[in-house]
């Protein structure tokens, strides 16, 4: 496994790998990330992974400074998972002095997370586009947990004619249903006990949907009731949207997606489930 910190050195190594799968990460890796790496390895001649906590996708009052980091542990896990190339840049490598260009995505990027976290998807789109230009993969792998991010990436990849296939992989979960996330390590014991209620709320709504319920108000109220009963009261959103547009429809379509965002102490938890 080769590790690079500069764009030039990374690009020089690419000539040895005619087909490449790519997994962009912010580090502090968990089984969800490693599952993406293993799938990328199985479906491509080689796999590249980036580790970069991207400052431009964090808001002024968000957790950039406290986001967990452990690059030595990450590299050991990636070697074990079969990664071939790791790109580990510092912020000044990707955002050198004088860099001012940002990518703004409309449509799907304006909904939900786009409203709750202004500027977030512009930061994501900018850094992912830069990484695609540097890595030049045939395929890139993302987790379904960040469902709206996946939709945003697919949108700008299509709009900007970037020659990469976007592969979205199932959510990795703990035994109690909590979606795996690097931020979970920051949950207090009390909030970790409450956190599986997100998955339970999604299951409750999925059950109603399977039984024919299409009234969005009823589906959303069912999710909120489960969260409230568990003591998760700081709900950013608990909604059912069209999985393509991320807009709320009444009644909901068969192409529906239930999504949650909840603040549990200092940690913002998100989860979703296709209905």
From Swiss-Prot:
The keyword Nucleotide-binding applies. Beta-alanine binds at residue 57. Its main location: cytoplasm. It comes from the Bacteria. Its EC number is 6.3.2.1. CDD domains: PanC. One of its GO terms (cellular component) is cytosol. GO terms for molecular function: ATP binding; pantoate-beta-alanine ligase activity. ATP binds at residues 26-33, 143-146, 172, 180-183. It catalyses: (R)-pantoate + beta-alanine + ATP = (R)-pantothenate + AMP + diphosphate + H(+). It holds the Pfam family Pantoate_ligase. The active site is at residue 33. It is found in: Cytoplasm. GO terms for biological process: pantothenate biosynthetic process. InterPro entries: Cyt_trans-like, Pantoate_ligase, Pantoate_ligase_C, Rossmann-like_a/b/a_fold. Keywords: ATP-binding, Cytoplasm, Ligase, Nucleotide-binding, Pantothenate biosynthesis. Pathway: Cofactor biosynthesis; (R)-pantothenate biosynthesis; (R)-pantothenate from (R)-pantoate and beta-alanine: step 1/1. Catalyzes the condensation of pantoate with beta-alanine in an ATP-dependent reaction via a pantoyl-adenylate intermediate. The reaction proceeds by a bi uni uni bi ping pong mechanism. NCBIfam families: cyt_tran_rel, panC. Belongs to the pantothenate synthetase family. Homodimer. This is Pantothenate synthetase. It comes from Gluconobacter oxydans (strain 621H) (Gluconobacter suboxydans).
């Amino acid at each position: 496994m080769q590790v690079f910190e500069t764009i030039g050195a990374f690009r020089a190594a690419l000539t040895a790998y005619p087909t490449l799968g790519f997994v962009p990460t912010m580090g502090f890796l968990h089984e969800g990330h490693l599952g993406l790496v293993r799938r990328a390895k199985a479906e491509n001649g080689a796999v590249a992974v980036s580790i970069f906590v991207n400052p431009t996708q964090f808001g002024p009052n968000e957790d950039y400074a406290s986001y967990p980091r452990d690059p030595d542990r990450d590299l050991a896990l990636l070697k074990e998972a079969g990664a071939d190339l790791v790109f580990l840049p510092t912020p000044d490598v990707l955002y050198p002095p004088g860099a001012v260009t940002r990518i703004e995505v409309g449509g799907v990027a304006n909904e939900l997370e786009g409203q709750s976290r202004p500027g977030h998807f512009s930061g994501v789109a900018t850094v992912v586009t830069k990484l695609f230009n540097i890595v030049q993969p045939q395929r890139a792998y993302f987790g379904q947990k960040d469902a709206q991010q996946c939709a945003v990436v697919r949108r700008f990849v299509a709009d900007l004619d970037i020659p990469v296939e976007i592969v979205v992989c199932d959510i990795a979960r703990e035994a109690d249903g909590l979606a795996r996330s690097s931020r979970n390590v920051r949950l207090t014991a009390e909030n970790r006990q409450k956190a599986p209620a997100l998955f339970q709320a999604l299951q409750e709504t999925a059950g109603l949907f399977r039984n024919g319920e299409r009234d969005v108000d009823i589906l959303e109220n069912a999710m909120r009731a489960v969260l409230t009963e568990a003591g998760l009261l700081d709900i950013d959103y608990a909604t059912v949207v069209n999985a393509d547009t991320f807009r709320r429809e009444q009644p909901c379509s068969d192409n529906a997606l239930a999504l949650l965002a909840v603040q549990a102490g200092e940690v913002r938890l998100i989860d979703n489930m296709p209905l």
